């Protein structure tokens, strides 16, 4: 039995033996909750969008969540967000030093970039594929009065153009708003194919063709995508100067092997000074979310 509280919204995760019991528990311990949803499917798509069933209260989907002296606005049905990673995000306040240049692909609504930028004098660029997450990511940078250059892009394509990708003069904000307004069917998109068809029609004609390729280098790259993030290790190794923080999922007995596989791939492309890993949360029985820290020469 597990659930998350995101602002005024509670989300229950299956399997659940007694829904009424957990709903009553939430209402007893979280008086401010106005809506309780059951997540009805796994986050299997690239956008990690949940399908939700309202169990109690008002059908509100947009909420405001606070952590680490930051505030985040989001729609729980349009973006992936985990309050369970609050402590993990806080750790980067100590890991990151002032004046670092940081890239964060798979940034969602910008929780990692904003928590870091709120506490450190840094230059951050974030990349996210989901236009809803980009929309809220830009809103959240303004709410928190921090400067995070937030880009709508597929990191697998955008890394080649990274030096020339900016939300300069609100160009990304404009594109995101146009995309969401012009393609209301995105409300129902849950498969990669449908989304990529829409995004490619728009993105390739509106942005990429107007840019020239250009590589940019970053002191630190943080990749908060545990499912499939390792597939982008090449791009990260090309762009990183010093540090890469990569997330993955692994069973208790497979953690060491998972880390070794990723490090073996990375060491073929770059010389590694040191690496370590940390378990940052559980996702099931003896299954964990891990962060792999790679220190480059």
Curated annotation (Swiss-Prot):
It is an enzyme of class 2 (transferase). It is found in: Cytoplasm. One of its GO terms (biological process) is tRNA N1-guanine methylation. Gene3D superfamilies: Met-10+ protein-like domains, Vaccinia Virus protein VP39. Disulfide bonds: none annotated. One of its GO terms (molecular function) is tRNA (guanine(37)-N1)-methyltransferase activity. PROSITE patterns: SAM_MT_TRM5_TYW2. Catalyzes both the N1-methylation of guanosine and the C7-methylation of 4-demethylwyosine (imG-14) at position 37 in tRNA(Phe). Belongs to the class I-like SAM-binding methyltransferase superfamily. TRM5/TYW2 family. This is tRNA (guanine(37)-N(1))/4-demethylwyosine(37)-methyltransferase Taw22. It comes from Nanoarchaeum equitans (strain Kin4-M). The gene is taw22.
